């Protein structure tokens, strides 16, 4: 037979459960659970700022550390595209475009983990502008859906529609280009 819980005991049980839930949430928040900021991104592991050197179209060196711009994939330095039946060094052009975007202006980067090559994965800004988004919107990088939430898909669509950067040429997806080169070697 079922026992009936007295009304006062039921209130204490409910209140105790509520207190436990609130304390658990606070413990996760303050003791290092996957803390989320307002956009839903993980908080960065660390921030780094200063003048950067361009390595290629999606990689920078800042304070001696290589940083990969998170969420984009630009043509590799040795990669060529085709325009009007002629090869175009689109990897070098992408790197030059990135260099033009940052110039000597300081960058503020939020580093969020590392890639398989040990480079810090970073979201970098200069003068309030998201560098990866600008590279994608200008057509010199693709939104990298494999490792991002599609954050730059709209910028890529705008570049494609406007035939900007590599979208004005015939090109191979940088990830496919790298895979083909690995298979050939």
Question: Where is each model-derived feature located?
Answer:
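Small beta-barrel nucleic-acid-binding modules, primarily SNase/OB-fold domains
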Residues: 1-185
């Amino acid at each position: 037979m079922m026992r009936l819980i007295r009304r006062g005991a039921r209130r204490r049980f409910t209140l105790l459960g509520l207190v436990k839930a609130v304390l658990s949430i606070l413990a996760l928040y303050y003791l290092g659970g996957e803390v989320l900021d307002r956009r839903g991104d993980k908080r960065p592991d660390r921030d780094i700022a200063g003048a950067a050197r361009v390595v290629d179209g999606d990689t920078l060196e800042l304070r001696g550390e290589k940083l990969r711009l998170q969420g984009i994939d630009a043509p590799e330095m040795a990669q060529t595209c085709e325009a009007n039946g002629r090869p175009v060094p689109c990897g070098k052009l992408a790197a030059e475009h990135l260099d033009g975007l940052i110039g000597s202006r300081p960058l503020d980067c939020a580093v969020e983990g590392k890639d398989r090559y040990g480079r810090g994965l970073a979201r970098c800004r200069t003068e309030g502008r998201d560098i990866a988004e600008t590279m994608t919107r200008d057509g010199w990088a693709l939104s990298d859906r494999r490792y991002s939430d599609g954050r730059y898909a709209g910028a890529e669509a705008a570049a494609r529609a406007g035939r900007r950067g590599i979208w004005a040429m015939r090109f191979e997806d940088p990830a496919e280009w790298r895979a083909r080169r690995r298979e050939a070697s």
